[in-house]
Design a protein with these regions (language model features):
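Active-site and NAD+-binding cores of ADP-ribose-processing enzymes
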Residues: 138-225
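Extended, helix-rich architectural segments
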Residues: 1-166, 174-175
Length: 225
């Protein structure tokens, strides 16, 4: 479950087309996380002055969320590679290629501790109403898979089709030991005229850019998946 450093609101305000609604939603989600961690307040309704009623906190929500997450993903889902619908009969070469690809996928999931991450993501989704799955490809680190909790990303869809994502931005806070200050990494995808662009920047706590990791660059994607 998410224990990440808080992302400054200013970064969301700069990216959101409706920051007031987004920040109100975030405030509600923060309250949900507080209830999950600390329990919900409960006070006796008895107004008698003969005694001081006990103030109790119950963690029923946390117990239910933990049990439901384990129930859903104690056994991880099977990941299968299927051929294109247009292929009527697989050749031996096709079957070999599919087997190798499935082996590669299983290896990537294992290296990313997919089973553990999936249970944590389920808890984040139950609490924060949504999570994002992000796959990154890097020459140094290979293929990495991450689940991003609600308080670390935003997305916006097309006015004409809510199934089309036009913007997706996610953030990751970290501590810069050289600067002795918190930094925030931002990765932004935008869909413009059928082309997906990506940009990466690093910001200080006030939202100012301290480093451009990747200038806005077109990708080979025609949609934000």
């Amino acid at each position: 479950m998410s224990t990440a450093l808080e992302i400054p609101d200013i970064l969301f305000i700069e990216e959101s087309s409706n920051p007031t609604a987004l920040l109100a939603d975030f405030q509600e989600i923060r309250k949900f996380y507080e209830i999950y961690r600390e329990g919900a307040d409960w006070k006796s309704a008895d107004e008698t002055k003969d005694f001081t009623p006990a103030e109790l906190r119950f963690k029923i929500s946390a117990s239910l969320i933990n049990k439901q997450a384990r129930f859903l993903f104690a056994e991880p889902p099977d990941i299968l590679v299927e051929p294109n619908d247009g292929i009527d009969k697989l050749t031996e070469a096709d079957e070999t290629a599919i087997s190798r690809l499935e082996s590669l996928v299983r290896s990537i999931l294992y290296e990313n501790r997919f089973e553990e991450a999936l249970i944590k993501a389920a808890k984040d989704c139950f609490i924060g109403k949504r999570v994002a799955g992000v796959v990154n490809f890097d020459e140094e680190h290979g293929v990495t898979l991450s689940f991003i909790p609600a308080l670390q990303f935003l997305f916006e869809t097309s006015f004409y089709n809510s199934n089309v994502i036009e913007k997706f931005v996610y953030f990751r806070a970290f501590f810069d030991s050289d600067a002795k200050e918190k930094r925030v990494y931002k990765k932004k995808y935008t869909l413009e005229e059928g082309i997906v662009f990506v940009a990466e920047t690093i910001h200080d706590p006030s939202g100012d850019i301290v480093e451009v990791v990747l200038e806005k660059t077109p990708t080979l994607l025609a949609a934000i998946p």
